[in-house]
From Swiss-Prot:
<protein>
    <recommendedName>
        <fullName>Outer-membrane lipoprotein carrier protein</fullName>
    </recommendedName>
</protein>
<keyword id="KW-0574">Periplasm</keyword>
<dbReference type="Pfam" id="PF03548">
    <property type="entry name" value="LolA"/>
</dbReference>
<comment type="subunit">
    <text>Monomer.</text>
</comment>
<dbReference type="InterPro" id="IPR004564">
    <property type="entry name" value="OM_lipoprot_carrier_LolA-like"/>
</dbReference>
<keyword id="KW-0143">Chaperone</keyword>
<comment type="similarity">
    <text>Belongs to the LolA family.</text>
</comment>
<dbReference type="InterPro" id="IPR018323">
    <property type="entry name" value="OM_lipoprot_carrier_LolA_Pbac"/>
</dbReference>
<keyword id="KW-0813">Transport</keyword>
<keyword id="KW-0732">Signal</keyword>
<keyword id="KW-0653">Protein transport</keyword>
<dbReference type="GO" id="GO:0044874">
    <property type="term" value="P:lipoprotein localization to outer membrane"/>
</dbReference>
<dbReference type="GO" id="GO:0030288">
    <property type="term" value="C:outer membrane-bounded periplasmic space"/>
</dbReference>
<comment type="function">
    <text>Participates in the translocation of lipoproteins from the inner membrane to the outer membrane. Only forms a complex with a lipoprotein if the residue after the N-terminal Cys is not an aspartate (The Asp acts as a targeting signal to indicate that the lipoprotein should stay in the inner membrane).</text>
</comment>
<dbReference type="GO" id="GO:0042953">
    <property type="term" value="P:lipoprotein transport"/>
</dbReference>
<feature type="signal peptide">
    <location>
        <begin position="1"/>
        <end position="18"/>
    </location>
</feature>
<dbReference type="InterPro" id="IPR029046">
    <property type="entry name" value="LolA/LolB/LppX"/>
</dbReference>
Length: 202
C-alpha cells in the first residue's frame, strides 16, 4: 500500500516532458489541482491474486495527499507537503517520515513534483483503448521500484492505474466516484496521532 501511495504522489509532477505523448499526459495532470475518489486495488503475482483492498483518497497539489484503506485492514496515509504519516490502526502504530525522504529514491514523485529528474526516467507512449486513453510509462532504469506504469484516462479523468514492480507483481487500481477540482478542507491533509499509539520517526 505504501508503494501505491508513493506512485500516486508521483503522478502530478510539474516537470515538462519533451515527447508528444508525455506532453499530452502532462497537460491532463496539470488540469487536476484537487481530486477525490474511492478506490479498489488488486495485487497479482504470476497470474494469481495476492491481495485485495479498497478505500478512499484525496489529493491537493502540490504534495498533499490522503489515502485511506478501509478493507481488509484499516490504514491511513497522510502527506502535508512536508511530512508523511502512516497510521496502521490494527498495530496502533504511526510512522512519521519527512515527505521527501519518504518519497525519494522510488518512482515516487510523479504526483507531487519534488523530484525534477523523475520525468526523464520513463519513456511515455499513448494509445486509445475504445473511449479510454492509456499512457504507458516504461522505466529507463532496471533499478526503479516500478518498471512500468499505466495511467488510464476517460477524457480528462484519471480512472485507473496499473503498476508493474521489480518482483513481477502487478497492482491494478480502479477509481470510482471521482470528483475533479473540488474545494477540499485543509484538515484532510493534517494528522494528529491518537492517544496511546506508538509513534515511530524515520
Amino acid at each position: 500500500m505504501n508503494k501505491l501511495f508513493l506512485i500516486l504522489l508521483l503522478i502530478f509532477s510539474h516537470e515538462v516532458f519533451s515527447q508528444t505523448s508525455a506532453e499530452v499526459l502532462q497537460s491532463k495532470l496539470n488540469a487536476i489541482q484537487t481530486m477525490t475518489a474511492n478506490f479498489s486495488q488488486i495485487v497479482k503475482a504470476k497470474n494469481r491474486e495476492v491481495s485485495r483492498s479498497s478505500g478512499s483518497m484525496a489529493l491537493q497539489r502540490p504534495g498533499r495527499f490522503r489515502w485511506q484503506t478501509k478493507d481488509p485492514l484499516e490504514q491511513l496515509i497522510v502527506a502535508d507537503g512536508q511530512k508523511m504519516w502512516i497510521y496502521d490502526v490494527d498495530l496502533e502504530q504511526v510512522t512519521v517520515k519527512n515527505q521527501e525522504k519518504g518519497l525519494g529514491g522510488t518512482a515516487a514523485l510523479f504526483l507531487s513534483g519534488y523530484d525534477e529528474t523523475l520525468t526523464h526516467d520513463f519513456d511515455v507512449s499513448e494509445k486509445q483503448k475504445g473511449k479510454l486513453t492509456v499512457f504507458d510509462l516504461k522505466s529507463k532504469s532496471a533499478k526503479e521500484n516500478f518498471q512500468r506504469i499505466k495511467l488510464i484516462f476517460s477524457q480528462s479523468t484519471l480512472i485507473g492505474l496499473e503498476l508493474y514492480d521489480q518482483l513481477g507483481q502487478i497492482t491494478d487500481v480502479k477509481l470510482v466516484q471521482i470528483k475533479s477540482n473540488p474545494k477540499l478542507p485543509a484538515k484532510l491533509f493534517q494528522f494528529k496521532p491518537p492517544k496511546g499509539v506508538d509513534v515511530v520517526k524515520q
